[in-house]
Amino acid sequence: MGDDEARSWIRGDETAKQMLSRVLKDRAFLLIPPLHRVPLRAGNVVEITGASTSAKTQILIQAAISCILPKTWNGIHYGGLGKLVLFLDLDCRFDVLRLSQMLKHRLLQANWLGNGAWWQLEESNVKSCKSAEEKTKTVFDEELYASCMKRFLYVRCYDSLELLSSLKTLHYRIQQQEACGSQVGVLMIDSIGAFHWTDRLSSSLALETHNRKSLSLTNVVETIVQELKKLLLVHSLVVLATKGTIYEEKYPANENNRKVSSNDHFSGNVASKAQQPPFREFMPSSWQAFVTHKIIIRKSADYQSLQTGQQNLLAYSLEWLQPQLSRIDRFIVDDVRKLTTIKPFYSKLLLIYIVIPASSSHAVWYCHCLVT
């Protein structure tokens, strides 16, 4: 090996000046409600815990749309980050069509008013087009839609080995996207505990065969955490991971025992007194130490009080466990299939808008925060 080859081999990937310019330009950013209480920085790992059908994937989709949307486009403010989203689907139930429909509605929302204040939209403006397809043709920006969808990288994994393989190739995929001018922003995992039981069974079978080379459940998770740490060292991104719950009480005792008035309880000005998480932790300690922020979502015990008109809306409560905040956010999820007038749901915390096209097979939800 000659001197030139040796120098090229030990040459760093970037200079100290390049490294500082890359790190210092990454500022904290806020996601849309209900993930807006804590500013997130590159390197943060947010764990969103909740039972099945607790709108965890819905929250990820809304956060992904806010990430892939640009801040402005042709003079219209969209309020996005304009960054790349990496979505690892471990549940294998992600519906790309729902992402597409929600993105189109988000674009229409901004185009209708041009300033994002779409709750001021009148009923006559909503019914100016006969169908959702006509709205898409008349107001929809296909070029912007295509550029946003290109920033969404979707990977489906069926077991832990495929997850490890995908994590090892993500660095190369990110480099390809960055070469095209797209900077990575968020890595989403839905959900991190999807393979827990299969890996646990495989570990038991490996112990019976006395095969030392077989990976145990703990070793698999440790390897996954190591690969994620490598990505965080090289790329400036935030990790959002959902996790299901097991052996969780329907309405935890710590929530029912809060001695507050009904007004204070609804406004969210209450503090959680529980020091332990209200669910059974099943992930290994390596993952628990890797997580920097923790959120739990529950079905609200007083969901029957959250009604608009004749519709019983599903209500959920979102609580920050790490860092522990004294405020509990509440949001609603609607599943209306017919075209309705845009009607906001007012509370002291969140303002939820529902826009459902008549031809859509999926519900579309948007959340906007009121000044409190």
UniProtKB/Swiss-Prot annotation:
Any GO BP annotation: reciprocal meiotic recombination
SUPFAM superfamilies: P-loop containing nucleoside triphosphate hydrolases (SSF52540)
GO cellular component: Rad51B-Rad51C-Rad51D-XRCC2 complex; replication fork
Signal peptide: none
Record PROSITE patterns: RECA_2
Main location: nucleus
CDD domains attached to this UniProt entry: XRCC2 (cd19490)
GO MF, one example: ATP binding
Keywords tagged on the record: DNA damage, DNA recombination, DNA repair, DNA-binding, Nucleus
Entries under InterPro entries matching the protein: P-loop_NTPase, RecA_ATP-bd, XRCC2
Cellular location(s): Nucleus
Functional description taken from the UniProt entry: Involved in the homologous recombination repair (HRR) pathway of double-stranded DNA, thought to repair chromosomal fragmentation, translocations and deletions.
Family the entry assigns: Belongs to the RecA family. RAD51 subfamily.
Protein's UniProt name: DNA repair protein XRCC2 homolog
Organism from which the protein derives: Arabidopsis thaliana (Mouse-ear cress)
